[in-house]
A protein has these predicted regions:
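A solvent-exposed, acidic/Ser-Thr-rich amphipathic alpha-helical stretch
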Residues: 69-98
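Positively charged n-region of N-terminal signal peptides that target proteins for export
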Residues: 1-6, 19-20
Length: 167
């Protein structure tokens, strides 16, 4: 009985460790072309204020904890679930914040591939990437704020899956 339990436990541990994807900088090289395509489209959509192109780069619904508080908010959660319709109505504006526009225009590919940070998304059990920008500078009165976008490969294309903040 003890042997059977140990065997089952060993198989479960082995299965769990071998099923985890490796998410590190080597993934950046493998995904380089797709990330470049994403960034080129993203940069162009922001430059031209094209919300249709931006919506094509998002997987709906996606969570956003700093999205615009307006009449589209329907509950008291600390984040908003951004649907296609709420995006089209007003939430697309998060992509036209001057600090984001400035940061996006600073980078070009392939030399700036490092702006994407790989991580293992424990919710989706997939490798994802984050990129960020400083939304509010730190000063003596407040700690500052950084906005992040998480992207993930979905059906052979990268899509924005969430937007969040750190302070």
């Amino acid at each position: 009985m003890t042997r059977s339990l140990l065997l089952i436990l060993g198989l479960l541990v082995a299965s769990n460790s071998f099923s985890q994807q490796k998410c590190d900088c080597s993934n950046l090289q493998a995904d380089k072309i797709l990330l470049q395509n994403f960034w080129t489209t993203f940069k162009d959509a922001i430059k031209n204020k094209n919300k249709t192109k931006l919506s094509n780069l998002c997987r709906f619904p996606f969570n956003c904890d700093y999205c615009i508080l307006d009449s589209t908010k329907t509950d008291d959660k600390p984040y908003h679930k951004i649907t296609k319709s709420s995006f089209d109505e007003s939430q697309y504006q998060i992509f036209f914040i001057p600090r984001l526009v400035q940061e996006v225009n600073k980078h070009s590919f392939p030399q700036d591939l490092f702006i994407f940070l790989p991580y293992f998304n424990t919710v989706d059990k997939k490798c994802s990437y984050s990129f960020s920008y400083i939304a509010i500078d730190e000063n003596a009165e407040r700690p500052g704020m950084q906005h992040f976008f998480d992207i993930q490969k979905i059906n052979g294309q990268f899509k924005i899956i969430s937007a969040w903040t750190v302070p």
